[in-house]
């Protein structure tokens, strides 16, 4: 053949690739030049497509399942983004966590559970459609805490049901119910200071060395063996004598203070009222806890109801009364050689031939014009007298605040705060004992005391309620202190006048006003004339029977007084 065919020009040539041979193992020996400086990150073919930004996924607030579908790959920092610092866009952000008040904590808990599929009628939650409605009794049995603590997000124990100071009998007729919102709005202004009618008793002078007592220089509280008379209105011989000529409403300062400060009370109390013609006599029942001082009555967490404990309401009331009587006598200059201030008449509750040690007390029988021909006559008391540089005596009302256990009482440590932050200690006492302090202030104002002396007495050991020490004293002017604690005397007189007017409209007989133990209500009852008489004790009622129970006992099995 004359013509030669060249196949090389028609078809491409095949070049054999370079195959690296790894003598020591499997795989390439060197990294190809085309893949140099390229970052590598492990990956998985099972990763979801919407991993970077998935707008279709539902937000899960439970951190337990936050990374349930997260991939174990892609955790390296090869593809991490680093933002360069730019001072022009710098802003301060407040990241402090705002503490919510207790009543707002957990208020959206049920709403959040509903959105996450765990609420009622939601997927995964409780289906209430088609459920049989239970009766009222079964609902309470199923959920005994239902309805408790609604204001605070169902937090805390259910409120304790207090017992009434007196058991309401079937033959008592309810006349009127006065709720606290109505009583708070009452006002009787322009009541002048009371006028002295009779003054009795003997007062001892105050020892000024007790003003220098502080936490570092404390003084033990002594046990003073003196008799303190707490005579009711109708048993007072002076009031019996005055009722024939002066006044038409008769009471004691303790009874008046209880009525005037009724809107601040939480515990139950009662006062017996007798209407004879156009005259009204207000009495306290015998053998009751009316004269005992309450402890932490207005506290958010009142004392426990364990009668065997020294911190039960009744035991704390006895302890507070014991402290108050001893403190009011210890701070005075005692002894036969010490000077004393004597009123016009002697103590009306002891005879001249009796040789007994009586507490220092001065009685003022005063009258007030309340309008509409209502003249109030009341017995008021002073605890001591102070000698001023000018020689004029200043009468004092001496009271004592006591610390029992600051941890249980939600209080402040007196030994840590009393010298440096006495205002904080007093503010805490005003929260926990608002009613007691208001009563003391009203009694001092009614008596016309120039000073209200407050003592701070604490236990030596929180578990020992028999030994106490004085940590300090503080004095106030009664009218100024009433302004500080937001106590309106116009409102106090208005409450008293309201009750007097209600009783004046009734027929002659015996009545009883009682504070409801669990509601802010005062009730007026028409009771039989022989109620609470000593003749009823044979029938198991009256003063020693089922006519009343303990004022501060929450249990039903409390001992009768």
From Swiss-Prot:
Cellular compartment(s):
Cytoplasm
GO terms for biological process, alphabetical: cap-dependent translational initiation; formation of cytoplasmic translation initiation complex; regulation of translational initiation
According to the UniProt record, where is the region Disordered?
98-164
Gene Ontology CC: eukaryotic 43S preinitiation complex; eukaryotic 48S preinitiation complex; eukaryotic translation initiation factor 3 complex; nucleus
Q: Which superkingdom heads the taxonomic lineage of this protein's source? A: Eukaryota
A molecular function (GO) term: mRNA cap binding
> What Pfam family is a match for this entry?
eIF-3_zeta
Give positions of region: RNA gate. Answer: 289-303
Bias category Basic residues: which stretches?
100-121
Keyword vocabulary terms for this entry: Cytoplasm, Initiation factor, Phosphoprotein, Protein biosynthesis, RNA-binding
Q: Where Phosphothreonine occurs, residue numbers? A: 128
Protein family membership: Belongs to the eIF-3 subunit D family.
Q: What is known of its domains?
A: The RNA gate region regulates mRNA cap recognition to prevent promiscuous mRNA-binding before assembly of eif3d into the full eukaryotic translation initiation factor 3 (eIF-3) complex.
Q: What does this protein do?
A: mRNA cap-binding component of the eukaryotic translation initiation factor 3 (eIF-3) complex, which is involved in protein synthesis of a specialized repertoire of mRNAs and, together with other initiation factors, stimulates binding of mRNA and methionyl-tRNAi to the 40S ribosome. The eIF-3 complex specifically targets and initiates translation of a subset of mRNAs involved in cell proliferation. In the eIF-3 complex, eif3d specifically recognizes and binds the 7-methylguanosine cap of a subset of mRNAs.
Q: Can you state the subunit structure given in the record?
A: Component of the eukaryotic translation initiation factor 3 (eIF-3) complex. The eIF-3 complex interacts with pix.
**Know the name of this protein?**
Eukaryotic translation initiation factor 3 subunit D-1
Q: What taxonomic ancestry is recorded?
A: Eukaryota, Metazoa, Ecdysozoa, Arthropoda, Hexapoda
């Amino acid at each position: 053949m004359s013509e030669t065919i060249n196949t090389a020009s028609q078809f491409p040539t095949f070049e054999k690739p370079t195959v690296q041979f790894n003598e020591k193992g499997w795989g390439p020996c060197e990294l190809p030049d085309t893949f140099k400086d390229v970052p590598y990150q492990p990956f998985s073919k099972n990763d979801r497509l919407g991993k970077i930004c998935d707008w279709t996924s539902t937000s899960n607030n439970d951190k337990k399942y936050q990374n349930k579908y997260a991939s174990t790959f892609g955790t390296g920092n090869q593809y991490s983004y680093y933002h360069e610092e730019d001072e022009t866009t710098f802003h301060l952000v407040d990241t402090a966590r705002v503490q919510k008040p207790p009543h707002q904590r957990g208020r959206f808990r049920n709403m959040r559970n509903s959105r996450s599929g765990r609420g009622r009628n939601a997927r995964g939650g409780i289906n209430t459609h088609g459920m049989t409605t239970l009766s009222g009794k079964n609902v309470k049995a199923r959920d005994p805490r239902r309805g408790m603590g609604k204001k605070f997000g169902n937090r805390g124990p259910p409120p304790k049901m207090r017992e009434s100071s007196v058991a309401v009998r079937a033959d008592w007729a309810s006349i009127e119910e006065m709720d606290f919102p109505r009583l708070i709005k009452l006002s009787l202004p322009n009541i002048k200071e009371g006028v002295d009618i009779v003054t009795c008793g003997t007062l001892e002078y105050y020892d000024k060395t007790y003003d220098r007592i502080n936490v570092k220089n404390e003084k033990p509280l002594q046990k003073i063996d003196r008799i303190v008379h707490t005579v009711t209105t109708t048993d007072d011989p002076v009031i019996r004598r005055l009722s024939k000529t002066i006044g038409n409403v008769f009471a004691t300062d303790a009874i008046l203070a209880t009525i005037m400060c009724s809107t601040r009370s939480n515990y139950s109390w009662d006062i017996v009222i007798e209407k004879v013609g156009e005259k009204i006599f207000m009495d306290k029942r015998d053998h009751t806890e009316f004269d005992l001082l309450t402890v932490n009555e207005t506290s958010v967490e009142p004392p426990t109801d364990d009668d065997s404990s020294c911190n039960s309401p009744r035991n704390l009331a006895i302890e507070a009364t014991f402290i108050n009587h001893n403190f009011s006598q210890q701070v005075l200059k005692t002894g036969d050689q010490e000077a004393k201030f004597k009123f016009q008449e002697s103590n009306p509750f002891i005879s001249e031939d009796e040789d007994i040690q009586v507490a220092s007390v001065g009685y003022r029988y005063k009258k007030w014009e309340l309008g509409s021909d209502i003249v109030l006559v009341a017995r008021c008391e002073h605890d001591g007298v102070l000698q001023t540089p000018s020689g004029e005596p200043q009468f004092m009302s001496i009271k004592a605040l006591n610390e029992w256990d600051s941890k249980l009482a939600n209080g402040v440590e007196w030994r840590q705060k009393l010298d440096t932050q006495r205002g904080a200690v007093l503010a805490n006492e005003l929260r926990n004992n608002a009613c007691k302090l208001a009563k003391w202030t009203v009694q001092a104002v009614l008596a016309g005391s120039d000073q209200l002396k407050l003592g701070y007495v604490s236990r030596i050991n929180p578990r020992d309620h028999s030994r106490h020490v004085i940590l300090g004293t503080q004095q106030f002017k009664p009218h100024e202190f009433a302004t500080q604690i937001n106590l309106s005397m116009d409102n106090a007189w208005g409450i008293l006048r309201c009750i007097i007017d209600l009783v004046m409209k009734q027929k002659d007989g015996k009545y009883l006003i009682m504070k409801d133990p669990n509601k802010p209500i005062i009730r007026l009852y028409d009771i039989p004339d022989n109620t609470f008489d000593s003749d009823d004790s044979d029938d198991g009622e009256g003063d020693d029977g089922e006519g009343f129970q303990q004022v501060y006992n929450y249990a039903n099995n409390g001992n009768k007084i």
